[in-house]
UniProtKB/Swiss-Prot annotation:
It is an enzyme of class 6 (ligase). IMP binds at D76, E77, G78, K79, N101, A102, G103, H104, T193, R207, Q287, T302, R366. This is Adenylosuccinate synthetase 2, chloroplastic. It comes from Ricinus communis. Binds 1 Mg(2+) ion per subunit. Homodimer. GO terms for biological process: 'de novo' AMP biosynthetic process; IMP metabolic process. Keywords: Chloroplast, GTP-binding, Ligase, Magnesium, Metal-binding, Nucleotide-binding, Plastid, Purine biosynthesis, Transit peptide. Plays an important role in the de novo pathway and in the salvage pathway of purine nucleotide biosynthesis. Catalyzes the first committed step in the biosynthesis of AMP from IMP. The active site is at D76, H104. Its main location: plastid. GO terms for molecular function: adenylosuccinate synthase activity; GTP binding; magnesium ion binding.
Length: 488
């Protein structure tokens, strides 16, 4: 399809003040996705009974035995909605990394809201087994709160959630230490969710962490916990630790251990046995590739690997077992917290996208920074993960804009091109973004359910992204509801 576009060079280089998140006095609305509890007598997808329905089922059923849904930006791309839809066609939905810093809100068919941070998104599909893998850090009070909320609303969790015996435990003190660490960093703070994720992974890395399997040995648990708490007290002056705290924590975790026991499993064995049995497995990634500890905008990253490699290390399955990976990317870009954001729109333009897209964090409620879609970063994510297809979300948010920009290239100040996404943040600060300007569309597309019915300009936008990135867009989101997903 041919169309006209123009190139525009951003004359304002990325500046350091953009990297540090400033709280914006906006009301924190929250995003949501809609899902329903599946009953045996109802169809697995509530889709229109036309050719689009047939195409969608064919698309989903063609996915490989082990498939994954991963974020392509800095998180908050809308992965939960796609996972919820796909989960109805998979036997297992598994989390492989992260912790309660990942979050989304889902609703059942009766409008009941579930705020989930640890339990995999497949929990509302009654035939789906949910696995929390060894790469996840588990905050037991948070997990039990989610389970209680689900059970009280009629969603059975018994026998449907497995927690890896190799997963590390995230304690309340990890969260306290997380806040103390941010306070130490002052103006250069990272913008963590303060859920204790970094400190827990740090404990894991220096090998004094406590794993789920340790709950089965309460005779040695107090000594291990004492080492952890003493280490935190020696590191942070503001952290007060004494014998009474240890006694209270040990008693609390004795109760937790008893309650968690039915959920504990050797999930590495479960996953590999399921692969041998030809069961279909969907891996749900938390956060996104641009927050990856190795490949993201370090140090403004998370502490795990939310890219393709994290699937294998976080679940204990072989790389050759992993097939289709779907990258989820917003039609524009958002970021929560500090860190580089080359295509960020400051001022009124950013506010417009923020309110139109209701861009406020599910986990923190913080307003998200907004900007144009960064093709350079997206291509980088596609290279790392080898995506077979993309899910372009929130395309409807761009409706009514007179023009839409794509950040298609980075250039040095002298105009020479820079052909990759740099690791050096100082270099990234100096680069300028080259934009391609495309026409907008002046109509609401949120009720459209067939790609052919899109305005020409919307089709041009989607197809230009495919052309620039080299990966097909198979799924397009035009609203929060389950039915607001177009299969291309």
């Amino acid at each position: 399809m041919s169309f006209t576009s123009s190139l525009r060079l951003d004359t304002n280089p990325i500046t350091s003040p953009k990297w540090v998140h400033r709280q914006v006095p906006l009301r924190p609305h929250r995003n949501f996705v809609v899902c329903s509890i599946k009953s045996p007598s109802t169809p697995s997808l509530n889709l229109a009974t036309d050719s689009a329905s047939t195409d969608s089922l064919s698309r989903i059923n063609s996915l490989s035995q082990v498939s994954g849904v991963l974020g392509c930006q800095w998180g908050d791309e809308g992965k939960g909605k796609l996972v919820d839809i796909l989960a109805q066609h998979f036997d297992i939905v598994a989390r492989c990394q992260g912790g309660a810093n990942a979050g989304h809100t889902i609703y059942n068919s009766e409008g009941k809201k579930f705020a989930l941070h640890l339990v995999p998104s497949g929990i509302l599909n009654e035939d789906t087994l949910c696995v929390i893998g060894n790469g996840v850090v588990v905050h037991l009070p948070g997990l039990f709160k989610e389970i209680d909320g689900l059970e009280s609303s009629g969603v059975s969790c018994t026998g449907r959630i497995l927690v890896s015996d190799r997963a590390h435990l995230l304690f309340d003190f990890h969260q306290e230490v997380d806040g103390l660490r941010e306070a130490e960093l002052a103006k250069s703070f990272i913008g963590t969710t303060r859920r204790g994720i970094g400190p827990c992974y740090a404990s894991k890395a220096i090998r004094n962490g406590i794993r789920v399997s340790d709950l089965r040995h309460m005779d040695t648990f107090p000594q291990k916990l004492d080492i952890l708490l003493s280490d935190a007290a020696s590191r942070f002056q503001g952290f007060k630790y004494g014998p009474e705290m240890l006694r209270e924590e040990v008693e609390k975790y004795k109760r937790y251990a008893e309650r968690l026991e039915p959920f504990i499993a050797d999930t590495v064995h479960v996953m590999n046995e399921s692969i041998e049995q030809k069961k279909k497995i969907l891996v749900e990634g938390g956060q996104a590739t641009m927050l990856d500890i190795d490949f993201g905008t370090y140090p403004f990253v998370t502490s795990s690997s939310p890219s393709a490699g994290g699937i294998c290390t976080g679940l204990g399955i072989a790389p050759r077992a992993v097939g289709d990976l779907i990258g989820v990317v917003k039609a524009y870009t958002t970021r929560v917290g500090s860190g580089p954001f080359p295509t960020e729109i400051l001022g009124q333009g950013g506010d417009l996208l923020r309110f139109a897209g209701q861009e406020f964090g599910t986990t923190t409620g913080r307003p998200r920074r907004c900007g144009w879609l960064d093709i350079v970063a997206l291509k980088y994510c596609c290279q790392i993960n080898g995506f077979s297809s993309l899910n372009l979300t929130k395309l409807d948010v761009l409706s009514d804009l007179p023009e839409i920009q794509l950040g298609v290239a980075y250039k040095h100040a002298d105009g020479t091109p820079f052909k990759s996404f740099p690791a050096d943040l100082r270099l990234l600060e100096q680069l300028k973004v080259e934009y391609e300007v495309l026409p907008g569309w002046k109509s609401d597309i949120s009720s459209i359910r067939n790609y052919a019915d899109f305005p020409k300009a919307a089709q041009q936008y989607v197809e230009r992204i495919e052309e620039l990135v080299g990966v097909p867009v198979h799924y397009i989101g035009v609203g929060p509801g389950r039915d607001a997903l177009i299969y291309k």
